[in-house]
UniProtKB/Swiss-Prot annotation:
Chief localization: cytoplasm
Organism ancestry: Eukaryota, Metazoa, Chordata, Craniata, Vertebrata
Keywords linked to the UniProt accession: Coiled coil, Cytoplasm, Membrane, Phosphoprotein, SH2 domain
Residues modified to Phosphotyrosine: 22, 250, 318, 330
Gene: Stap2
Residues annotated as domain PH: 20-120
Protein source organism: Mus musculus (Mouse)
Residues annotated as domain SH2: 152-248
Region annotation Disordered: where it falls in the sequence: 291-320, 338-364
GO terms of molecular function: signaling adaptor activity
Coiled-coil regions listed: 390-410
Name of the molecule in the record: Signal-transducing adaptor protein 2
Tissue specificity of this protein: Widely expressed.
Length: 411
């Protein structure tokens, strides 16, 4: 059985090339680059896209013109062989330098950038009528594009939240759009500026009139879109007001590039679970939580502390004199014991006299009385009594002799 032939497959359609307001080769040097790098660049809305070649569909990097501050011409500081033209794009967070081969390309890039940023065709550049006509067409396209989208500085916040955002992130801008307080299609504008060191917060009402927005000021001004409302506040304040753009360079959700096994195409995927930490193996037991112990049980288990040793008596460090009588009598010795005792200074030890004290005078013994006493005790032994009397006389004579010698030494 014959099978129906399938139609031949046609060539795979490639993606449509991106549409740019203006595109050409452009050499770029960022704040982290040491030298210029050549790209194929294109202006797309409020962004400058950089490609490796004019055949690439995805840009390598972009510059956000919503952070535009000013354009500045660069002086030629290189060698005489460098005939390129230089200009710088100053943004709120960085400054990027560019280099092009001709003056026409330099003026074209500056003209288109100012057209999409300021929503007007610049008149201070060296441009031909054809160039001005091209920029007028770009201006119309950009106004239509912005009318269909909400400005980046429009946030769904309340009046108080808008004030807090402008106060907390002053580096992100000082002008913010929010829904009106009447619950209708109206819009409110909140601004915050510093005057003599003090913040000044203002709120403006924008009414909806059909397809237009009317700024409710002394001289009401009608705008075709919310983007035009933002541009009105920026241009009429000499760019003192800057649209609020919260820095969201960091992602909040983890993602990765995943390839489809069926068709082989790559797509951005987000994990379906959030791991709080490394999972434990199945055979590893989880540690048990600590058991709370009451204070009373802990006190019962604690060993008793040994008693503290007694402190030494401070009086032991002092020498107490024995029978140290006062040297003189004072009038205030009758003070009661309840009064505060005054510590006395230790007395100096008394000096010994240079000469020994005089010995007390001993009376002379009565020889007759002594002789009579011993005579009675010895009974009738006259010979013993006479010998004893003789010895006593000798002792008495010896004592008298020693006494006379001592008196002689004293005198």
């Amino acid at each position: 059985m014959a099978t129906a032939l399938s139609p031949p497959r046609g060539p795979k359609l490639k993606g449509a090339p991106p549409s740019h307001y203006y595109e050409s080769f452009l050499e770029k040097k960022g704040p982290c680059d040491q030298d210029y790098r050549k790209f194929w660049a294109g202006l797309q809305g409020l962004a400058i896209c950089f490609y490796n070649s004019n055949r690439d569909l995805q840009p390598l990097e972009k510059l956000d013109l919503r952070l535009f501050s000013k354009l500045r011409d660069e002086a030629l500081l290189g060698s005489s062989r460098d005939t390129a033209y230089h200009f710088s794009l100053v943004l709120r967070d960085q400054e990027v330098k560019f280099k092009v081969e001709s003056l026409e390309s330099c003026e074209m890039w500056k003209g288109f950038i100012l057209t999409v940023v300021e929503l007007r065709v610049p008149s201070n550049l060296t441009l031909l009528p054809g160039h001005l006509y091209m920029m007028a067409e770009v201006l119309t396209k950009e106004e239509v594009r912005r009318a269909a989208e909400v400005p980046w500085c429009f946030l769904q916040v309340s009046r108080l939240e808008a004030q807090l955002l402008l106060e907390r992130y002053p580096e992100c801008g000082n002008l913010l759009l929010r829904p009106g307080g009447d619950g209708k299609d109206s819009v409110s504008v909140t601004t915050r500026q510093i005057l003599n060191g003090s913040p000044v917060v203002k709120h403006y009402k924008v009414k909806r009139a059909g397809s237009k927005y009317v700024i409710d000021v002394e001289d009401p001004f009608s705008c075709p879109s919310l983007e035009a409302v933002v541009n009105y506040f920026v241009t009429h304040t000499k760019r003192a007001l800057v649209p609020f753009l919260l820095d969201e360079d960091y992602e909040k959700v983890l993602g990765f590039v995943d390839s489809d096994r069926e068709n082989g195409e790559s797509a951005w995927a987000v994990p379906s679970f959030r791991a709080s930490g490394p999972a434990l193996p199945a055979n590893v037991l989880k540690p048990l939580p600590p058991v709370p112990v009451s204070v009373s049980s802990q006190e019962d288990k604690l060993p008793q502390l040994p008693p503290l040793p007694q402190l030494p008596d401070t009086d032991e460090n002092y020498v107490t004199p024995i029978e140290d009588s006062p040297a003189a009598e004072y009038m205030n010795q009758d003070v009661s014991l309840s009064s505060q005792a005054v510590p006395l200074k230790p007395k100096k030890p008394a000096r010994l006299p240079a000469k020994p004290p005089k010995p007390s005078v001993v009376p002379k013994p009565d020889l007759k009385a002594i002789t009579s006493v011993w005579t009675r005790k010895l009974g009738g032994s006259s010979s013993q009594a006479s010998s004893l009397v003789t010895r006593l006389g000798d002792i008495t004579a010896e004592l008298e002799e020693k006494l006379q010698k001592r008196r002689a030494l004293e005198h």
